[in-house]
Amino acid sequence: MASEALHQVGDGEEAVLKKENFNMMNALDQLPKPFSNPKSMNRTVTTKGLPLASKGNLVNFLEDDTINLLKPLPVEDSDCSSDETSISAFSSTLLNPIKLAVTQPNSSFFAGMLEGELNKLSFSPMAKNAENEDLALGPCPCPSKSQMATRGLLDLDNPELETETSSTHSESSVVVDLPDTPFIFEHTVNNSTAVISWTYALGKQPVSFYQLLLQEVAKTQENELPEAKNRPWIFNKILGTTVKLMELKPNTCYCLSVRAANTAGVGKWCKPYKFATLATDFSSFPENYPIQITVRRKEPRQKIVSIGPEEMRRLEDLEYLFPC
């Protein structure tokens, strides 16, 4: 009788537990499910720039060289990419409508970054570890009679005991020079996008990342300086030497500049590069065949001519050759 009652009590507890689990599952099903994060699915999401604190001309910003990134603040309705390192204090409606997509860097860029990281390493810890491994793996030296003392202690007052102390000099190579100024050599534009490419000085100071400064300017004559229409926007930590600016305004002029950065700091901004998007005219050309224009330029080369003392002529010789 007692066993039967105990069996019934056990069945009742099991039924209560099943009922509680069922109620808990129903409560969990009624909770709103979290949205799936598309940023974790696609790592090639484009990023947006940050507005600078003050409004001014891009040329003035480059001359003063006092550009500071805004401090990152949490924004609830921000739709920036997860790759972006900082978010501005403005709401998402005031963020830069211009998007930037970075292409995959070439092998030379990664080679320069790898060379810079290897230069930071110190060879002294490696030598010290190798020495410790040799001591650990090598044969144990036989203790001399002078080292044998009572209870295994070492007699430091024994003059026969010879001790040596040596220190290794730590040698580390750290980048101390700032990176060179990039040179923008090509751009391809249509009515809403622009692909900008610049050079990377291989074999010189390594580059960790680039910064790009962009500003919309009013159309002016060739000899006039561009007039700013709004505040500049900056794109930070760009890996690679080619970027694609998207969602630009048609028939609009832009001005941009690029600078490199490494462990020593940031380099100088390059000269402002001016380009313009094409006008949207579907009456002349169909939408299925958009027109794009590519502009390339070469970096100016400087030639240094040295003249020795033996090649220089005296003043009287010049007067004889070129009489007045």
From Swiss-Prot:
GO terms for cellular component: nucleus. It comes from the Eukaryota. InterPro entries: FN3_dom (IPR003961), FN3_sf (IPR036116), Ig-like_fold (IPR013783). Pfam families: fn3. Residues 179-280 form the Fibronectin type-III domain. PANTHER family: FIBRONECTIN TYPE III DOMAIN-CONTAINING PROTEIN 8. This is Fibronectin type III domain-containing protein 8. It comes from Homo sapiens (Human).
